[in-house]
Amino acid sequence: MSGRGKQGGKARAKAKSRSSRAGLQFPVGRVHRLLRKGNYAERVGAGAPVYMAAVLEYLTAEILELAGNAARDNKKTRIIPRHLQLAIRNDEELNKLLGKVTIAQGGVLPNIQAVLLPKKTESHHKAKGK
């Protein structure tokens, strides 16, 4: 025979996504497509979408971890925008990164100036001492 057909060839391996190869949850293929369609550069390397997906996944995990802690502190089981706001604004680095970002329904950080707080009276202690 002249080598036609697949008599003894190995079966093709099952397709494996680039996300699973990189050990990521975020979609590497989608990030690659968005980088190409976004006109950021004429060409996009193979490693760029993997790296970017990993960075996005890390930042998301970090924010969700802190927001989950904020929800637990408020005795809630569901993360709401308020918890995201508290998580981001209480973390120095995330606050710097997302400083110009407005979170809808996030509210503000509770902050009362020390000058406005009621003064502690010392006269009560002096009266007992006499």
UniProtKB/Swiss-Prot annotation:
Residues carrying N6-crotonyllysine: 37, 119-120, 126
Residues modified to N6-glutaryllysine: 96, 100, 119-120, 126
Effect of residue 2 to A: Blocks the inhibition of transcription by RPS6KA5/MSK1
GO terms under biological process: heterochromatin formation
N6-(beta-hydroxybutyryl)lysine, modified sites: 10, 14, 37, 96, 119
Residue(s) carrying N6-lactoyllysine: 10
Molecular function terms, GO-annotated: DNA binding; protein heterodimerization activity; structural constituent of chromatin
Pfam families the record matches: Histone (PF00125), Histone_H2A_C (PF16211)
Reported modifications of this chain: Deiminated on Arg-4 in granulocytes upon calcium entry. Monoubiquitination of Lys-120 (H2AK119Ub) by RING1, TRIM37 and RNF2/RING2 complex gives a specific tag for epigenetic transcriptional repression and participates in X chromosome inactivation of female mammals. It is involved in the initiation of both imprinted and random X inactivation. Ubiquitinated H2A is enriched in inactive X chromosome chromatin. Ubiquitination of H2A functions downstream of methylation of 'Lys-27' of histone H3 (H3K27me). H2AK119Ub by RNF2/RING2 can also be induced by ultraviolet and may be involved in DNA repair.
Modified residues annotated as Symmetric dimethylarginine in this record: 4
N6-(2-hydroxyisobutyryl)lysine found at: 6, 10, 37, 75-76, 96, 119
Record-listed Phosphoserine modification sites: 2
Protein name: Histone H2A type 2-A
Source organism (scientific name): Homo sapiens (Human)
Gene this protein is translated from: H2AC18
